[in-house]
Curated annotation (Swiss-Prot):
The gene is SLC31A1. Residues 1-61, 154-156 are extracellular. A motif (Methionine segments (Mets) motif) lies at residues 7-12. Its main location: membrane. The C-terminal domain mediates copper(1+) binding and is involved in the copper(1+)-dependent-ATOX1 interaction. The C-terminal domain appears to act to limit transport through the pore by regulating the rate of exit of copper ions at the intracellular side. The N-terminal domain can collect copper(2+) from copper(2+) carriers in blood. The N-terminal domain, in the trimeric arrangement, tunes its reactivity with copper, promoting copper(2+) reduction and copper(1+) stabilization thanks to the presence of histidine (His) and methionine (Met) motifs. Glycans are attached at N15, T27. This is High affinity copper uptake protein 1. The keyword Ion transport applies.
Length: 190
C-alpha cells in the first residue's frame, strides 16, 4: 500500500506493535510537497525536560544551550507575570472609566389623581470614547499574550511549562491581592 501522501509520517497497521522510541521530540522529517522541499518538526506529545533544539513560538527562535533555556525561562516567567498584571490593570481601568449611573426621579400625574414617580437612567459612555478604545487595545494585547503562553505551554517542555505556571502564580500573588472582584471578566485561557 502506497503511503507517500502521508508527508513523511509513519503509520502502523493493526498487526504491528509500537516500540519505545528514544528520539528527541523535535526530530525533523523531510518531505516533498509539489516539487519543493520543506521540513516538518514533530511535536512532542509528552512532557520532557531538555534544552536541545527546542523551538519557541517561531521557527527561527530555537533553544540549543542551557543558557538559552535559562534566558527563555526568565522571559516566559516575566511574560506570564505581565499577563496577570495586565488583567488587573484592565479591571482597574474599567472600574475607573465606568460612568456612574444617575437616577433622576420626578413626580408625574397618574390616573385617578394619583402621583407616580418616573425614573430616568442617564448613562454617558460612548463606543468611540478614549477609555473604550484603550480597553480595546489592551484586550487585543491580552488575547495575544494569552495565546503565546498557551503555545509555549504546548511545547511540552517542562522548563517552559514551569515558567508559565510560576510566572502566572507570581503575577497573581503580586497584582491580585487588592482584587475585590469575585468573577474575573477578563479571563481568557485558564
Amino acid at each position: 500500500m502506497d503511503h507517500s501522501h502521508h508527508m513523511g509520517m509513519s503509520y502502523m497497521d493493526s498487526n504491528s506493535t509500537m516500540q519505545p522510541s528514544h528520539h528527541h521530540p523535535t526530530t525533523s522529517a523531510s518531505h516533498s510537497r509539489g516539487g519543493g522541499d520543506s521540513s516538518m518538526m514533530m511535536m512532542p506529545m509528552t512532557f520532557y525536560f531538555g534544552f536541545k533544539n527546542v523551538e519557541l513560538l517561531f521557527s527561527g527562535l530555537v533553544i540549543n544551550t542551557a543558557g538559552e533555556m535559562a534566558g527563555a525561562f526568565v522571559a516566559v516567567f516575566l511574560l506570564a507575570m505581565f499577563y496577570e498584571g495586565l488583567k488587573i490593570a484592565r479591571e482597574s481601568l474599567l472600574r475607573k472609566s465606568q460612568v456612574s449611573i444617575r437616577y433622576n426621579s420626578m413626580p408625574v400625574p397618574g390616573p385617578n389623581g394619583t402621583i407616580l414617580m418616573e425614573t430616568h437612567k442617564t448613562v454617558g459612555q460612548q463606543m468611540l470614547s478614549f477609555p473604550h478604545l484603550l480597553q480595546t487595545v489592551l484586550h487585543i494585547i491580552q488575547v495575544v499574550i494569552s495565546y503565546f503562553l498557551m503555545l509555549i505551554f504546548m511545547t511540552y517542555n517542562g522548563y517552559l511549562c514551569i515558567a508559565v505556571a510560576a510566572g502566572a502564580g507570581t503575577g497573581y500573588f503580586l497584582f491580585s491581592w487588592k482584587k475585590a472582584v469575585v468573577v474575573d471578566i477578563t479571563e481568557h485561557c485558564h
